[in-house]
Amino acid sequence: MKKTLLGSLILLAFAGNVQADINTETSGKVTFFGKVVENTCKVKTEHKNLSVVLNDVGKNSLSTKVNTAMPTPFTITLQNCDPTTANGTANKANKVGLYFYSWKNVDKENNFTLKNEQTTADYATNVNIQLMESNGTKAISVVGKETEDFMHTNNNGVALNQTHPNNTHISGSTQLTTGTNELPLHFIAQYYATNKATAGKVQSSVDFQIAYE
């Protein structure tokens, strides 16, 4: 019994020493921050799964990289956004928008536009879909698996915290006002040339979630 106990104590001591000897040059730490708010907006039922059809366009309109064509408006409507229905004030958001993301077809090399998902023999090449804010001038960078601006390096060992919110990817951000039941959020979709386009079909898709500020 004494030998067994002694062996266990030696083993524990050894394990403790191993744990204490982790090389700081080959290890690190990632800290995650977030916040849950009281707001209760919902996506209007008929807007949860939308189809947006862009008019046909001639390939000469997309003959050069970054050419765009056929800006097409679409709207996603939220409901139950009256801020007075949210409890308290400390954890209540003032603005709401949408967070667009896709883990499979975001094209980092072409301004985070959406790749053409068509795989039929007659699909267009060098053509993506770009999302824009409703003003038609600000591009939306769809979040993908290679998006990096959520990460922040800790400066001099001081961790960033929730006083550094990341709202870079909230699109259509709109002020919440009392009495708001339905809240339409407006956006634009357009063709985007990644090089000289060829004729054919174009299809892409993006996921979204409600996001608050």
UniProtKB/Swiss-Prot annotation:
Main location: other
Keywords, alphabetical: Disulfide bond, Fimbrium, Signal
Compartment list: Fimbrium
GO annotations of cellular component type: pilus
Signal peptide positions on this chain: 1-20
GO biological process, one term: cell adhesion involved in single-species biofilm formation
Gene3D superfamilies: Fimbrial-type adhesion domain (2.60.40.1090)
InterPro entries reported for this sequence: Adhesion_dom_fimbrial, Adhesion_dom_fimbrial_sf, Adhesion_dom_sf, Bact_Fimbrial_Adh_Pro
Entry-linked SUPFAM superfamilies: Bacterial adhesins
Top-rank taxon: Bacteria
Disulfide bridge map: 41-81
Described purpose of this protein according to its UniProt entry: Mediates adherence to oropharyngeal epithelial cells. Helps the airway colonization process.
Record-stated family: Belongs to the fimbrial protein family.
Protein's name in the database: Major fimbrial subunit
Source species taxonomy: Bacteria, Pseudomonadati, Pseudomonadota, Gammaproteobacteria, Pasteurellales
